[in-house]
Amino acid sequence: MDDAEGTMTGSFDGIDIAVGRMLVSSTSQAAEMVNKVLEYHDEKSYGRWRNNFVIYSDDADNSTDATLQVGLNDLADVLTTQKPFVNVKKIHTDAYVQQVAAGGERYPEAKKDFLDALQLGALVFNYFGHGNEEFLARERLFEKLEAQNLTNRYRYPLFVTITCEFTRFDDPNRFTGGEYMYWNKAGGAIGLIATTRQIGVSTGFTMNNLLTEDLYAYGSTNYPTIAEALRLTKIATGSDNRRVVFYIGDPALKLAIPKPKVVLTKINDVP
């Protein structure tokens, strides 16, 4: 660079370039991830699943956790108001019966509904709650092994996880559930917007709402790339905690939001 070309000046603390990380470690794995992007645009991927949006919330173990469900529910309601073509499925774990097994508390019916929804397909899955590298929530609402075994080919969602370390990709000695969700070559996700470290509830709320607004371009039909939506969200979020949120996937990819092309030409065979 020329002298002083890399000097940081001014007070701008935002992001200039939309970034996406395609996490691969070999040419064969890179080819598999590129192939998923091609399949995402293939005619075989067309279907009503692209109108679906699924929310999945952790249960309320304390008063703070209760706000996770309320906030995620409100997010979904605003989305359907802004974009009426979106069909929202709400999976709130506290709406299900909790069972206690030898390994701890579980929500088998909520988990089944979530896995079934993944197989049927949705454009976006949005989870808000606790999590670690191995699973979502202490009730194991979604586990690493399940991410590896998904078979939802041609129905790849964007997986949004506002949690802790479910997609902590900077430890080469420990692969996470989020990474396996992305690496699944015939299932899993087309990309993830995910946290790599713990995120505060307040920042999580703010980013989740802004992200959905940016992804679905409220008030417009000019939809941005997923990476650009996250860039706009990060700029609009004041907290430094926003830095733990990353986009895993093709930075040039847009959500496959259906474009209505119905043209009325005749009524009862009369032009």
Model-predicted regions and their roles:
Residues 1-271:
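Cysteine-dependent hydrolase recognition
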